[in-house]
Amino acid sequence: MNLEAFILGYYKQFDDLLAYFLDEIVIDTKYQNKGYGTSLIKAMEDIVKINGVTLIELSSVNDKAHIHFYKKSGFYIADNFIPMGKFLKETNI
């Protein structure tokens, strides 16, 4: 059995709201651009809504395809977050 697609995320409790952080959505390249990602996002939204979530957050690769996909699903670029990172050892990236 092959795994063609999955969503991975977790719940975050803030003072006044419950959020869901969409950590990863993966679709096998054979199934991309066929509506599966949109269907997964919708199913995830339905599930987290039932559990009381009022905000979904994510971070994404900064390219046109990813931005278009998430905007098409109703997400927006948040002005109040700055992605940051720190390498803990030398890397070629």
Per-range role (PLM):
Residues 22, 56-60:
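Conserved hydrophobic beta-strand within the GNAT/NAT acetyltransferase core sheet
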Residues 10, 28, 59, 81:
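Conserved residues at the C-terminal ends of beta-strands
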Residues 27, 33-46, 72:
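Conserved acetyl-CoA-binding loop-helix of GNAT-fold acetyltransferases
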Residues 22, 44-48, 66:
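Short hydrophobic clusters on alpha-helical segments that form packing/core surfaces
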Residues 1-17, 23:
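Acetyl-CoA-dependent GNAT
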Residues 38, 50, 54, 62-80, ...:
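Conserved active-site alpha-helix within GNAT-family acetyltransferase domains
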Residues 85-92:
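Short beta-strand-to-coil "C-cap" segments at the C-terminal boundary of structured domains/repeats
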